[in-house]
A protein has these predicted regions:
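Class I S-adenosyl-L-methionine-dependent methyltransferase catalytic core
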Residues: 1-94
Length: 94
C-alpha cells in the first residue's frame, strides 16, 4: 500500500496520474467550487479503482449533492466546521 499526495492545480495533477487509485481525497480551496470538475475528470480519465471512493472535504455551509457526475454519496461525517462527504461510482440502475 502506498499514498501519493499531489499538491497544486487539480487538472494538472489528475492528468499526471498513470494508475487507478482506491481513494481520492479532495481538499480544494473551500469556496472555489472545484468539486464538480474534479469528479468529472476522475470519471472521464477512469482514475478510480472499481471499488474506490472519493472523499470530498468541505465546510458545513456547503451541501454536497447526493449524486455528482455519476458518483453517489454513501456517507457523510462532520468534524466541527468541516464535513467529509464520501462518494462511490453509482450503479447503472441508479
Amino acid at each position: 500500500d502506498k499514498a501519493v499526495i499531489i499538491p497544486g492545480d487539480y487538472s494538472k495533477a489528475l492528468t499526471s496520474i498513470r494508475e487507478k487509485a482506491d481513494i481520492f481525497f479532495l481538499d480544494p480551496p473551500y469556496e472555489a467550487g472545484y468539486y464538480e470538475n474534479c469528479f468529472k475528470m476522475i470519471k472521464d480519465l477512469s482514475l478510480l479503482a472499481e471499488d474506490g471512493i472519493i472523499i470530498a472535504e468541505h465546510r458545513t455551509n456547503l451541501d454536497m449533492p447526493d449524486k455528482l457526475q455519476g458518483f453517489v454519496k454513501v456517507k457523510e461525517r462532520k468534524y466541527g466546521t468541516v464535513v467529509l462527504s464520501i462518494y462511490e461510482l453509482g450503479r447503472i440502475d441508479e
